């Protein structure tokens, strides 16, 4: 679900926000700042020696990203954020959730449970499922000839995906912790 949302943001950002009066480099600058913030956060995980602690903190990071995404989407009208601020917060929360889960989460998961293998299978499987969702959305739009209001769609999907992923990652975090404590007995 996070991959579908990321694809929509990246592929249809010009349709989501009308920034015709802004520099064409604005999107790149926002994503550069987001990337640097996330790299800084990820660098801190090099100091975690305990894999279960790192894994649970990564889950917390994903949940925080999802909850922020949900909050900003659900209360968009109330918050009355400027489009650039809204885009920055949405990008940061989406990429924190997506990149955390898509990258270092699987490394720590494999290390925590001493699974023989590498992250390639997990990442390929998640990518396949995500791209299948994107293709389904775009095919439905094209074949049913649906006109979309991209901003409303993105905000609605962000709210829904953020809420669902928050719940699922909370459950997953509890299950991972329980499994880890059972294996350590």
Model-derived features: positions:
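Alpha-helical transmembrane segments of polytopic membrane proteins
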Residues: 25-36, 88-94, 152-167
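Multi-pass alpha-helical transporter architecture, strongest
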Residues: 143-146, 159-185
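C-terminal transmembrane helical hairpin of 12-TM major facilitator-type secondary transporters
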Residues: 50-100
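Juxtamembrane "helix-exit" motif on the non-cytosolic side of transmembrane helices
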Residues: 12, 16, 71-80, 139-147
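Transmembrane alpha-helices of Major Facilitator/SLC transporters
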Residues: 4, 24-51, 65-69
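Extracytoplasmic gate region of multi-pass secondary transporters
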Residues: 1-24
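A late C-terminal transmembrane helix in Major Facilitator Superfamily
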Residues: 109-145
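Intracellular juxtamembrane helix-capping segments at the cytosolic ends
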Residues: 96-114
């Amino acid at each position: 679900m996070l991959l579908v949302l990321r694809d929509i943001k990246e592929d249809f950002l010009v349709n989501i926000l009308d920034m015709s009066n802004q520099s064409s480099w604005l999107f790149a600058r926002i994503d550069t700042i987001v990337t640097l913030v996330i790299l800084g956060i990820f660098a801190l995980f090099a100091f975690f020696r305990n894999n279960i602690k790192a894994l649970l903190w990564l889950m917390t990071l994903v949940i925080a990203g999802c909850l922020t995404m949900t909050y900003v989407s659900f209360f968009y009208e109330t918050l009355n954020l400027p489009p650039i601020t809204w885009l920055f917060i949405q990008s940061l929360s989406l990429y924190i959730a997506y990149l955390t889960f898509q990258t270092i989460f699987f490394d720590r998961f494999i290390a925590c449970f001493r699974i023989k293998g590498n992250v390639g299978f997990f990442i390929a499987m998640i990518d396949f499922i995500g791209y299948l969702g994107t293709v389904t959305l775009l095919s439905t739009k094209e074949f049913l000839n649906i006109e979309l209001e991209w901003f409303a769609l993105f905000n609605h999907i962000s709210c829904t995906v953020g809420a669902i992923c928050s719940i699922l990652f909370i459950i997953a975090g509890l299950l991972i912790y329980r499994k880890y404590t059972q294996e350590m007995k």
